[in-house]
């Protein structure tokens, strides 16, 4: 039987629900794909592990924009500190990196120089003479008071009449013959009397009362040379001097022969914070590993723990700085067959260094890979002309220029990628 609805005439017909089209209800927004960083073929790019704390490269890339602007809230300077071992002593590598960056972004001068130096005789980027100082370094085998050390791991005590002179030069690298500002840094518990003589002209006297903070005296002008003489400085510790520009790039070389980077954690926090007030770095580059890697070393757990502590210490004292860790470069040894090979311990250390960068949220550049990887140090040694020494460990100035060029190109490419990503995300 057919079912019949006896009340159908009395019912209101059901209204059909129209299917809404895109004009009546909003569609979900189009999801914008994430910007994908690329790396140019043949280039070893920086691996940025920076997070929301911004200790990767972002802060540095943004700081570079300051060199071409005239914002009243900043001085137009971008400051870079390079901490390392004997691989970069005498301004190897950093001299050419400084020149490349200053040519592009402006700036002049060699930057920070310790009061005395064992490499002053063969550092080509500044003429450095001194006398009358008692020098102390964290790597000394004799007693060293860690509480007194400054940013370079040194402190210097003057005798009456002690002097230090810096003279610009033009034999190696450009933009170093003159600077616009020269400074000296010290900590005095008693009054101090200094004399500054610029360009071998008239002497100018300076007197400062005791202070509990890091002090700085500066002279300005077109400065080709500056000589500081200590007339009286009871209870005063000196740390270094500088030749800088007033705008553009400042790059300071803090090399320390025999260092592994672990001694950075022992520099007093108060001292580093006061240096940060005087020289607020936008980028800190760490170059270590020569004094850590062993021929067959596999386990570097203790080193990883120590360097993580050093990096955290730098983060706390330089809260605005980007931090870039460079891997150890290639280091070769002769096998029993007389063949030159990369130390196995080097490759193991590089894996630890990359983990250190990732765990601390900073940036990492694989210098070993950039050099050419396996056996690349031997290739540099045997190049014509040679770019490294026959210890198959240290580069020379030609090798430094080669590696500086590789890092410079990587930094510029990273900056371009960062700018593209920022523009894309603001569309």
Task: Give a label for each model feature.
Residues 17-82, 136, 149-160:
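Membrane/wall-proximal cationic-aromatic binding patches
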Residues 84, 186-188, 327:
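Short beta-strand/turn micro-motifs composed of small residues
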């Amino acid at each position: 039987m057919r079912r019949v609805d006896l009340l159908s005439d009395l019912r209101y017909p059901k209204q059909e629900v129209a299917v809404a089209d895109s004009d009546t209800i909003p569609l979900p927004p189009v999801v914008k794909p994430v910007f994908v960083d690329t790396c140019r073929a043949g280039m070893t790019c920086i691996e940025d592990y920076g997070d929301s704390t911004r200790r990767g490269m972002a802060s540095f890339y943004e700081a570079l924009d300051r060199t071409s602007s005239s914002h009243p809230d900043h001085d137009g300077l971008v400051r870079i500190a390079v901490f390392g071992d004997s691989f970069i002593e005498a301004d190897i590598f950093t001299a050419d990196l400084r020149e490349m960056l200053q040519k592009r972004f402006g700036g002049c001068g060699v930057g920070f120089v310790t009061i005395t130096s064992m490499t002053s005789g063969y550092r080509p980027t500044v003429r450095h003479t001194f006398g009358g100082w008692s020098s102390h370094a964290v790597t000394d085998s004799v007693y060293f008071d860690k509480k007194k050390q400054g940013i370079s791991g040194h402190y210097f005590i003057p005798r009456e009449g002690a002097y230090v002179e810096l003279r610009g030069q033009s034999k190696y690298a450009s933009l170093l013959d003159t600077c616009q500002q020269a400074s000296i840094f010290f900590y005095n518990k008693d009054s101090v009397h200094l004399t500054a003589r610029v360009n071998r002209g008239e002497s100018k006297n300076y007197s400062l009362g005791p202070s509990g903070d890091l002090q700085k005296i500066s002279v300005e002008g077109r400065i080709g040379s500056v000589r500081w003489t200590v007339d009286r400085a009871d209870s005063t510790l000196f740390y270094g001097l500088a030749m800088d520009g007033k705008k553009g790039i400042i790059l300071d070389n803090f090399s320390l022969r025999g260092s592994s980077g672990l001694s950075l954690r022992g520099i007093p926090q108060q001292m580093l914070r006061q240096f940060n007030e005087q020289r607020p770095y936008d980028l800190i580059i760490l170059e270590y590993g020569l004094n850590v890697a062993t021929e067959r070393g596999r386990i570097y757990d203790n080193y990883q723990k120590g360097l993580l502590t050093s990096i955290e210490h730098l983060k706390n004292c330089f809260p605005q700085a980007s931090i870039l860790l460079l891997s150890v470069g290639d280091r070769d040894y002769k096998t029993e067959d007389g063949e030159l090979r990369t130390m196995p311990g080097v490759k193991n250390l590089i894996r630890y260094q990359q983990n250190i960068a990732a765990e601390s949220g900073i940036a990492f550049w694989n210098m070993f890979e950039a050099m050419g990887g396996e056996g690349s140090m031997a290739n540099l040694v045997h190049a014509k002309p040679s770019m490294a020494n026959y210890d198959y460990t240290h580069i020379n100035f030609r090798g430094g220029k080669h590696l500086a060029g590789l890092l410079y190109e990587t930094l510029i490419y990273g900056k371009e990628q960062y700018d593209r990503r920022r523009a894309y995300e603001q569309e």
